[in-house]
Amino acid sequence: MRNIVIPLTALFLNAMAVSAQSVSNVFGFPSTEPGYSLGVSACYAGQIGDYLVMAGGCNFPTPGNKTYYAGIYAARVDATVLNWQLVGLLPEPAAYGATVANGDSLLFIGGNNAEHSLKSVYSIHLNASGDKAEVQRLAHLPCTIDNMAAAMSGNNIYLSGGNQDGKPSANVLHHNMVDGKGQWYIAATVPGSPRVQPVSAATDGNVYVWGGFYVNGENSEVHTDGYCLNTTTGAWTALAAPRSVNGKQTTLSGGIAWTEGKRVFATGGVNKDIFLDAISGRYEFVKKEDYLLQPIEWYKFSGNLYTFDVKGNKWLKTKFADKALARAGAVVVPTEIGTYYIGGELKPSVRTPQIVIVKE
C-alpha cells in the first residue's frame, strides 16, 4: 500500500463537535507487496507488545481482478506515523478471517482466498526486535469459515455466523484456549436466519452479535437487530438495532465492534436499503450494470460511532459520526492511545489505505 496524504478537512466534515469522541489521521501503510498500497479490506490485525501487526486482506488492483495477499507487516505503535515493514508471510494469501489476541501472540482464524475457504488457525509471534514473525499452525477448525465475527471472553473464543463449510450460517463456534483439548465445537446458534459479516463482542460471559446479511433471492435479509448469548445458561436475549446520529435504525453488516470496559463500540457497515436492493437482485435503485459505477457517497456506508451500554443492555444515543469511519470490511485494533481503524472499502471494489485513531 502506498502512503497517501488525505486532507484533514475531508476527514472531519461530519464530526459532531458536541461529543468528546474523535477521529485523527495516522500516516503510513504497508507497500511491499505490489498492489497492497491501494488499501485492503478484511485483513487480519492486532497488537503484539509495542507493535501493530496486520496481514493478508484483499483488493482490486485493476477492475474485476480481486487479489489476495500473504504479507505480515509490523509497525511500532504511534499516534502520527506508522513505519511498516514486512516481517513474514502467511502460508497462503487470505482475507475475511478473524483475529484474536492470545498472550504475546495473535491468532489468525479462518478466512478465504480465490481458491478456497480456510479451516486453519495460525499463531503469530514477533521476535524481540519486531522484525520477524514466527507462524505456527494450530489445530484446525471443524469446518471452513469466512466472513464471520470473532469475540473473546476470558480464555474463550467465539466465532459467530459467516460462511461455514461454504454455506451461510448462524452457528457460534467456541474454543477454550486453556482446557488442553484444543477442540472447537458448535456452542449455539443465533436465532433466525444466517448472518454473514455480522459484528460481535464479548464481556462478562456474554456474547453479543449484531447485523449480518443472508443472500436468498427475493427473501434476502440484511439484519439490523442483534442477540446476546449468556454462555453459562445458553439463553439468547434479543437486542435492539443501533441508531444513527439522526435517529434512524441502521445495520452493522460489514462493520466492526470492540469492547472497552463495560461498553461495546461499533462503527462502519453498509446501508441496509441499498445493499438489500442489490443482494436480492431487485436493483430498483439503479440498474445492475450500473451498481458498481456510482460515486462513493451514493452507497451511504455508515460513519456513525455507536456505543452499547452492557450494564443497561441498551444502545446509548449516537452523538458522533465521521466520513472517515464510513467503510465496510475495516478492522480495529484497540490500544492504550486509542483504537486504530484500518483499511476497508469505501464502496464495492474500492479500498482505502487510510488508518485513523478513534477516541471513544
Identify the residue ranges that each predicted region occupies.
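Bacterial Sec-dependent N-terminal signal peptides
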Residues: 1-23
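Kelch-like beta-propeller repeat domains
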Residues: 21-360
